[in-house]
Amino acid sequence: MAVADDIALIRKQEEVLVFPAFDEAVAFKIGSAIRARAIAENLPIIVDIRLWDRPLFYAAMPGSNASNPDWARRKINVVRRFLRSTYRMVLEQQRPDRAFKIGEGLDVSDYVLAGGGFPVTVKGAGVIGVIAVSGLPEREDHGVVIDALCDHLGIDKRGLVLASEAE
């Protein structure tokens, strides 16, 4: 799939994966589903779900490491700043160094171009938070979030899931 096609599909994900409401219980349910998948598939990830003012869910799986929370924090900052998926930002920016252009004024210690951060959007309210996964290749981090959101919202994944890079 071409980069432009992936960007278009991620935009569609951002438009479709919208919550009617989002609170601690919803965050726990989604976080727990991601954690259960990680256990079942031995995924060495961390998951961090938060509103802008506070964390709601966090889990670190065996095999994750000390750098994963920092990667997640920097992904969270990108979603907060740009109100869009970090993987979409990766594809739009096409920067091999994973840093934003100097003119953006974004410190590499606080912002990173890496997939796995996805906005929590509530109908009528807009983007209120973020779900971040770190520990897998960025396209897979992104996919873990998308799968969980589709499952939670009861949305058919067909037509929303990115093809694997091998395809």
Curated annotation (Swiss-Prot):
How far does the signal peptide extend, from start to end residue? none
Question: What Pfam families would the database entry show?
Answer: HbpS-like
* InterPro entries cross-referenced by the UniProt entry: PduO/GlcC-like (IPR005624), PduO/GlcC-like_sf (IPR038084), YBR137W-like (IPR010371)
Instruction: Determine the domain of life of the protein's source.
Output: Bacteria
- UniProt record similarity statement: Belongs to the UPF0303 family.
Q: Which NCBIfam families match?
A: PRK02487.1-5
What protein does this entry describe? UPF0303 protein mlr5144
Organism of derivation? Mesorhizobium japonicum (strain LMG 29417 / CECT 9101 / MAFF 303099)
